[in-house]
Amino acid sequence: MDAKLKYKAKKIKIVFFDIDDTLRTSKTGFIPATIPTVFKQLREKGILTGIASGRGIFGVVPEIQDLKPDFFVTLNGAYIEDKKGNVIYQHQIEKSDVEEYISWTKDEGIEYGLVGSHAAKLSTRTELISEAIDPIYPNLDVDPDFHEKADIYQMWTFEDEGDDLHLPDSLSDKLRMVRWHEHSSDVVPIAGSKAAGVAKVVEHLGLKPENVMVFGDGLNDLELFDYAGISIAMGVSHDKIKEKADYITK
């Protein structure tokens, strides 16, 4: 760690971690034995901890819950709770936009998922969908009309079109897609991101971006790396993340 980074590190008062391929291996669920020690040491130094994930709070596995983070920034910043379960911030997608999105997926011939604050449902179940979603949320139910029963905070595409897929003009000024798997993208509010969610927590605490350190690996961490005082990329990170990182783990 160079002198400049050491100086910046003295200002850190809260550390946010991504979950998949940062705290745990997404394919196997393995969590290094050193992780609980890291959280314990941060607490002993008076440094707060948080999770910043595209997952819903219902998808934060028990092993991560056991680390006792102070804050949970979930669904790419759309739903935030503290460790006591108090809601710090929430931003639902307008029902009319959800309905238009579903109509668009049918026109495109692709499948979708709908994510509430504490549950998620699938439009159908296929091998392609299972390959993408089961490592994150095993055994999700099929309910294509979930939006009629719950507020929706995030949606998914399930397809094999990759970066060739784009939202229609009528939705692209309200929603955006963030690719997280070769067969799936998160569909989130246009201003929604992990960075926006972390900023809500920082504002809630009366802190500044320079007081924040983040650990991440994926494209949905890009804005977070721009926002935080110190950004740490995992060795397995996407190249675009590594380019923005202050430090890359081995």
Where do the language-model regions lie?
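Residue-level signal for inorganic ion chemistry
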Residues: 42, 76, 155, 225, ...
